[in-house]
């Protein structure tokens, strides 16, 4: 059933984090939320929901405290499979565009049920909206918006086939609050309305079952 989001990315980090990460103290948390450059090179913080690690002075959106883990150096953060922030460059090296786009798609795949905008994604994934839009299209061949739509329509197909949820409920489940817009988008991407897609899927299932 498509009710749960795949957390494989998070789990890939967790087995390494416990060995290398330090406890987050109030002092370090204050340094993070205040972007305190005085703590740069004293520690680095990683965000489990994005797979990115930063300097304390990074100007990106303040993460949820429960998603943060602390590393004394960049080597240990890298060893735990976190990748350096493209904005604050904690390793003083530029992250390859392909790796950055992988992080973005990974985040979308896990969080497509939420409200996603170019601005919010750029903030979460530590880049500028314009650069993110341009880089994503260069690597993937489609825009960020098109990719999000693709992921949502794919998830909607699963709901239509595997559940009896109402069309409006499915729209909400895949991150689209406006049911008429969802129906229009689904038809644009598949050539069928959601109701017609469900009907055809059931007919195909019945036909195959009677073979």
Curated annotation (Swiss-Prot):
Recorded hits in SUPFAM superfamilies, A to Z, give: Ada DNA repair protein, N-terminal domain (N-Ada 10) (SSF57884), Homeodomain-like (SSF46689)
Q: Which organism is it from?
A: Bacillus subtilis (strain 168)
- What is the name of this protein? Bifunctional transcriptional activator/DNA repair enzyme AdaA
The protein's required cofactors: Zn(2+)
Q: List residues binding Zn(2+).
A: 54, 58, 85, 88
What broad class of enzyme is this?
transferase
Q: Where is the HTH araC/xylS-type domain?
A: 102-200
Q: Give induction info.
A: Up-regulated by methylated AdaA itself in response to the exposure to alkylating agents such as MNNG.
Quote any Pfam family the record assigns: HTH_18
Listed under catalytic activity are: (2'-deoxyribonucleoside 5'-methylphosphotriester)-DNA + L-cysteinyl-[protein] = 2'-deoxyribonucleotide-DNA + S-methyl-L-cysteinyl-[protein] + H(+)
Q: Write down the DNA-binding region ranges.
A: 119-140
Which residues does the entry assign to the active site, renumbered to this chain? 54
């Amino acid at each position: 059933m498509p009710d749960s989001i795949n957390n494989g990315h998070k789990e890939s980090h967790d087995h390494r984090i416990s060995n290398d990460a330090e406890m987050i103290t109030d002092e370090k948390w204050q340094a993070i939320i205040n972007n305190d450059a005085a703590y740069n090179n004293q520690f680095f913080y990683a965000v489990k929901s994005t797979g990115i690690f930063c300097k304390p002075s990074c100007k990106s959106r303040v993460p949820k405290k429960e998603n943060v883990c602390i590393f004394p150096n960049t080597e240990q953060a890298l060893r735990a499979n976190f990748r350096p922030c493209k904005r604050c460059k904690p390793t003083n090296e530029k992250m390859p565009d392909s790796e950055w786009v992988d992080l973005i798609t990974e985040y979308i795949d896990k969080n497509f049920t939420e409200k996603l905008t170019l601005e919010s994604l750029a903030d979460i994934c530590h880049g500028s909206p314009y650069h993110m839009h341009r880089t994503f299209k260069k690597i993937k061949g489609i825009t960020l918006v098109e990719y999000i739509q693709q992921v949502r329509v794919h998830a909607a197909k699963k709901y239509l086939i595997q559940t009896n949820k109402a069309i409006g409920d499915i729209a909400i489940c895949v991150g689209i609050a406006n049911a008429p817009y969802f129906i229009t988008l689904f038809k644009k991407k598949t050539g069928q309305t959601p109701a017609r897609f469900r009907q055809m899927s059931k007919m195909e299932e019945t036909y195959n079952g009677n073979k």
